[in-house]
Amino acid sequence: MQIYWEENKVIQVLMSTYNGKDYLREQIDSILAQNCKEQMGVSLKLFIRDDGSKDGTQKILDEYAEKYPDKISWYQGENIGVIKSFFELIEKSDEKVEYYAFSDQDDYWHKEKLSAGIKQIKNMTNYDVKEPLLYCCSPLLVDENLKEIDNKMTRKEKRAGFENAVVENIVTGCTIVMNKKLRDMAKAYPPKFTVMHDWWFYLLASCYGKVYYDKNQYISYRQHGTNTVGYNTSKVKEFKDRVKRFRGNRQNITKQLSEFIRIYKLYNKKEPDNTLFFNDEVKRKIRLAYELVKYSKKVKYIPKRVAILKKTGIYRQRKIDNIIFQIILLSGSY
């Protein structure tokens, strides 16, 4: 529709590669085939950081950069891992574009992926308030040959929100489209620790702005033996990983919230009069994060944790996960 047309606007796709030669061409081709220019008037640029590949990935990147010099650029980085790689891409991303998106190296994007995200970002935009906006969608799980596999585990039962983000990440990084405000906030104070880069962006947007989770699936999320992070397709492995998340990752989640609180203080110090960081709703959310950190683990804090559950409505998406989470939170194991 004409109302969504944005002449001369640009979206920059940020991709991190590491030993990705097997599926990289298919991924890049699907990005180049996006219809955001035709549907939205928004041009596309692809900016790639290689994280020290040793399988010839760089040759493929050279090939595409030479063939599409106006659309694709890349640079060689040291091996620092996927989280730091994406935050470095944020640091080096183009200041002048309006939208940003993350990309993995081994998926397949449906042609409407970016235009769907841009359209929703525009729908969420309040031009009187500069707030961080994040769009993400449900990933379609596929095998190495892009054949659909069991997708029950990608379905979300509840809404996206900060009360969910403090204990669970539902944002798959490669489905993200964000506005410049969210990118700027992440760039200003990158975290010293986060469980995963996409989880950090979920926390930022759900605390200070808006998140839209699209149940439509615009990305084929490839599952194979070498992808660094992905969903597990084995039900047994899925259950074991769920238990592991509750038992092992709870400390990382608390550590992540502590870092989130630290950076909130930096935002306030830099812009003490900015109502984006200093309003009743944000203060309520930060207080929730603070209480989860302060009253974790020790048995004597069980009454406090009961009160937190009652007054805040913290939740996980899946019913079984929510029950297990509440039990371990109240028992003092969290």
Question: Would you name each region that the model predicts?
Answer:
Residues 1-234:
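Nucleotide-sugar donor-binding/catalytic module of glycosyltransferases
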Residues 222-334:
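C-terminal subregions of glycosyltransferases and related glycan-biosynthesis enzymes
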